[in-house]
A protein has these predicted regions:
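Ser/Thr-rich, low-complexity intrinsically disordered terminal regions
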Residues: 1-129
């Protein structure tokens, strides 16, 4: 974890991925899977990660809402979006926000990296660069 990430985390209590992210690690992930197959794989993978609780799933809009408690007792609200980009391709974006007013010291960034790492392990053979 870089010093810059920690400094940003002093003030910011959210992090998200997108196509336009300046940092490569925060770019949207694309997989060579239909949206339905991508949804199944992402949903089942997220349910198996210790420390994360799936609160809500809305397959029609491709959103999975998770919650994670940090070691310091803060709660992170995480939204994972599985989007259709073509008939045989889907995209996965993650948004994580801390409850409370103080910065997260990079916790949301680490959560996104952990979730993407788990998804890449499970879906690596389908990943597109």
């Amino acid at each position: 974890l870089s010093l810059k990430r920690t400094l940003v985390g002093l003030f910011r209590s959210h992090e998200g991925t997108s196509d336009r992210a300046k940092e490569p690690a925060l770019k949207t992930r694309y997989y060579n899977l239909t949206k339905d197959k991508g949804w199944e794989e992402v949903s089942s993978t997220l349910k198996k990660i210790p420390g994360y609780k799936v609160l809500h799933e809305v397959q029609s809009v491709g959103e999975i809402i998770l919650e994670k408690k940090t070691a310091f007792g803060r709660t992170l609200d995480i939204t994972v979006s599985v989007l259709n980009t073509s008939p045989s391709r889907c995209a996965v974006d993650i948004y994580s926000a801390s409850r409370g007013s103080l910065g997260d010291l990079g916790a949301n960034y680490r959560v996104i990296m952990r979730l993407y790492d788990s998804l890449d392990k499970k879906l690596g053979k389908h990943k597109l660069d």
